[in-house]
UniProtKB/Swiss-Prot annotation:
Identification of the protein by name: Matrix protein 1
Organism (species): Influenza A virus (strain A/Gull/Maryland/704/1977 H13N6)
Function according to Swiss-Prot or TrEMBL: Plays critical roles in virus replication, from virus entry and uncoating to assembly and budding of the virus particle. M1 binding to ribonucleocapsids (RNPs) in nucleus seems to inhibit viral transcription. Interaction of viral NEP with M1-RNP is thought to promote nuclear export of the complex, which is targeted to the virion assembly site at the apical plasma membrane in polarized epithelial cells. Interactions with NA and HA may bring M1, a non-raft-associated protein, into lipid rafts. Forms a continuous shell on the inner side of the lipid bilayer in virion, where it binds the RNP. Determines the virion's shape: spherical or filamentous. Clinical isolates of influenza are characterized by the presence of significant proportion of filamentous virions, whereas after multiple passage on eggs or cell culture, virions have only spherical morphology. Filamentous virions are thought to be important to infect neighboring cells, and spherical virions more suited to spread through aerosol between hosts organisms.
Positions of region (RNP-binding): 165-252
Main location: virion
Keyword RNA-binding: yes
Membrane topology (UniProt): Peripheral membrane protein
Gene Ontology cellular-component terms listed: host cell nucleus; membrane; virion membrane
Positions occupied by motif Nuclear localization signal: 101-105
Protein family per UniProt: Belongs to the influenza viruses Matrix protein M1 family.
Gene Ontology MF, one: structural constituent of virion
Gene Ontology biological process terms, A to Z: viral budding from plasma membrane
Length: 252
């Protein structure tokens, strides 16, 4: 796996699924391929994206700044600086300085990532802030190692919380999660339908599912009643994909 592929993988792992994720993936691909060279416009676009947390925006801004060539005098962006200040905690800053000194001795991406993984997310963000604010310099490879270590820690905590939700025994949360999944699956079916012959059928199934979810939310139902809805919808989607010749990896 090439270095940039690895960076893209880690960065995308912390972004919530949806149309915005696809858009960011495309931007990253363009930046890494040298197709997008307007850092100013890129940062302005990033700043106004909804949904993303300030830290995620800070990490993306850091990656764009590392990758896109720019004039030396280009201003640093406040939204990135604020996100990478370790919540203003002096402990994070102290640890960030210690980490920075260690990173200065590293020359490889993997070496830097290994060193960085033993620090907290706050310290890692502060260390990125040091480099972003030009208070310290490391090689691009080492900076990418720091980025990937930070993303790995964030993705780990997201995965833990996701697993807790999936394995929860609370029937109300499970019920709501099934309905949300049914809605998202319906949306995916509508997007995939396009102008194919089977489009009308897909749209009809998706429309029925949406109405069902709306009705369930309006009148309230027993928490187990949504299990069949989600499963039926997933089966319909998979059957539709087979006819379309589209094979999506386990869409769940």
């Amino acid at each position: 796996m090439s270095l940039l592929t690895e960076v893209e993988t880690y960065v995308l792992s912390i972004i919530p699924s949806g149309p915005l994720k696809a858009e960011i993936a495309q931007r990253l691909e363009d930046v890494f391929a040298g197709k997008n060279t307007d850092l100013e416009a890129l940062m302005e676009w990033l700043k106004t994206r909804p949904i993303l947390s300030p830290l995620t925006k800070g990490i993306l801004g850091f990656v764009f700044t590392l990758t896109v060539p720019s004039e030396r005098g280009l201003q640093r962006r406040r939204f990135v600086q604020n996100a990478l200040n370790g919540n203003g905690d002096p402990n994070n800053m102290d640890r960030a300085v210690k980490l920075y000194r260690k990173l200065k001795r590293e020359i490889t991406f993997h070496g830097a990532k290994e060193v960085a993984l033993s620090y907290s997310t706050g310290a890692l963000a502060s260390c990125m802030g040091l480099i972003y604010n030009r208070m310290g310099t490391v090689t691009t490879e080492v900076a990418f190692g720091l980025v990937c270590a930070t993303c790995e820690q964030i993705a780990d905590s997201q995965h833990r919380s996701h697993r807790q939700m999936v394995t929860t025994t609370n029937p109300l949360i499970r019920h709501e999660n099934r309905m949300v999944l049914a809605s998202t699956t319906a949306k995916a079916m509508e997007q995939m339908a396009g102008s194919s012959e089977q489009a009308a059928e897909a749209m009809e199934v998706a429309g029925q599912a949406r109405q069902m979810v709306q009705a369930m939310r309006t009148i309230g139902t027993h928490p187990s009643s949504s299990a069949g809805l989600k499963n039926d919808l997933l089966e319909n989607l998979q059957a539709y994909q087979k006819r379309m010749g589209v094979q999506m990896q386990r869409f769940k």
